[in-house]
Amino acid sequence: MSKDLEVAGRYANALFQVAQDKDLVDVFSEELTELKAALKANEDFVKLLENPTFTTEQKKNLASAVFEKINPTLRDFIYLLIDRSREDYLSVIADVYQKRVNDLNGVADADVYSVVPLSEQELTALSRVFATKMNKTKLNIQNHIDKSLLGGVKVVIGTRIYDDSLKTKLKDMERQIKA
């Protein structure tokens, strides 16, 4: 595990614990998702926030103006990150926090690779089947197009790969013929 992920994980876990204690897990989840999207969309703000020439107070004032509508506890958490010069970890903290929320709710992320975009019905069917296999209540599926598969699908959930693509079947057949 990289040091950045380890540091972000400690902060995310602490925030998650506070959220559980205050019954704000879902509120923080939504606000962190919005916050991460805002940071991604506004790189200039991120550069200002991470600029070492700004004082801690200037950074807090900037954050206060931008994040005025978020939960006060979450805003205080952001101030804590600024105080400790960890504001550059905010996006990673949001990711780790969301993973904790997903684990709590029995949700997993899945990447589905196919030759053509899958319909909502197909994605729902895949979600139902693989959620059961993974002992989860739901899968958040991201459909990716990969023309090299030739047909079928490849499903990646965490470290598990379920490959039912034509490409893999042909490679397996080739190995059997050569053996």
Curated annotation (Swiss-Prot):
Gene3D superfamilies: N-terminal domain of the delta subunit of the F1F0-ATP synthase
GO molecular function terms listed in the Swiss-Prot or TrEMBL record: proton-transporting ATP synthase activity, rotational mechanism
Gene: atpH
Species this protein is from: Listeria monocytogenes serotype 4b (strain CLIP80459)
Taxonomic superkingdom: Bacteria
Family: Belongs to the ATPase delta chain family.
Function: F(1)F(0) ATP synthase produces ATP from ADP in the presence of a proton or sodium gradient. F-type ATPases consist of two structural domains, F(1) containing the extramembraneous catalytic core and F(0) containing the membrane proton channel, linked together by a central stalk and a peripheral stalk. During catalysis, ATP synthesis in the catalytic domain of F(1) is coupled via a rotary mechanism of the central stalk subunits to proton translocation. This protein is part of the stalk that links CF(0) to CF(1). It either transmits conformational changes from CF(0) to CF(1) or is implicated in proton conduction.
NCBIfam families linked to this entry: ATP_synt_delta, PRK05758.2-4
A GO cellular component entry from the record: proton-transporting ATP synthase complex
Membrane topology per record: Peripheral membrane protein
Protein name: ATP synthase subunit delta
Signal peptide: none
Complex formation: F-type ATPases have 2 components, F(1) - the catalytic core - and F(0) - the membrane proton channel. F(1) has five subunits: alpha(3), beta(3), gamma(1), delta(1), epsilon(1). F(0) has three main subunits: a(1), b(2) and c(10-14). The alpha and beta chains form an alternating ring which encloses part of the gamma chain. F(1) is attached to F(0) by a central stalk formed by the gamma and epsilon chains, while a peripheral stalk is formed by the delta and b chains.
Record has Transport as a keyword: yes
Stored SUPFAM superfamilies: N-terminal domain of the delta subunit of the F1F0-ATP synthase
Pfam families: OSCP (PF00213)
Subcellular location(s) of the protein: Cell membrane
InterPro entries: ATP_synth_OSCP/delta_N_sf, ATPase_OSCP/dsu
Keywords of this entry: ATP synthesis, Cell membrane, CF(1), Hydrogen ion transport, Ion transport, Membrane, Transport
